[in-house]
Amino acid sequence: MEMTNAQRLILSNQYKMMTMLDPANAERYRRLQTIIERGYGLQMRELDREFGELKEETCRTIIDIMEMYHALHVSWSNLQDQQSIDERRVTFLGFDAATEARYLGYVRFMVNVEGRYTHFYAGTHGFNAQTPMWEKYQRMLNVWHACPRQYHLSANEINQIINA
């Protein structure tokens, strides 16, 4: 992350104020203030994660994934024979915190801040699937989009989607 000295000074002052406003996280803000003031390039890359960007297309894809899981669960709930498909298979897991942190952050934002998909169970890890999921979800979306009735899926269609 490239910053001018003036930008670094402003950000340093912001962290100093946050230290006073949020004593519970003061140590974290002091650390970030030191990194900014001294210009530690390696550690400044951490800020890229905090101030990163998700393109509109990516945000829409994540919402589409969440909508697919909503449709899967609703369709599963309407099945005559729910025993043929384990409910956990139609439950949204989230994304991997280690490799898909920005996606995970967006999911948490959508649920906790925007109030969408609040019926999704975050689990003990807060939608951290603990394994990369993006490619799996892409395959699932391709199958789901090919279904003629995306919100009234048959057991066969549900199985095709979750096994994609």
From Swiss-Prot:
Q: Which InterPro entries match?
A: UPF0304_YfbU, YfbU_alpha-helical_sf, YfbU_helix-hairpin_sf
Q: SUPFAM superfamilies this protein is in?
A: YfbU-like (SSF116960)
Q: Which domain of life is it from?
A: Bacteria
In this record, what's one Pfam family? YfbU
Entry similarity comment: Belongs to the UPF0304 family.
Please name the NCBIfam families in this protein's record.
PRK05445.1
Q: Which HAMAP family match?
A: UPF0304
Q: Output this protein's name.
A: UPF0304 protein YfbU
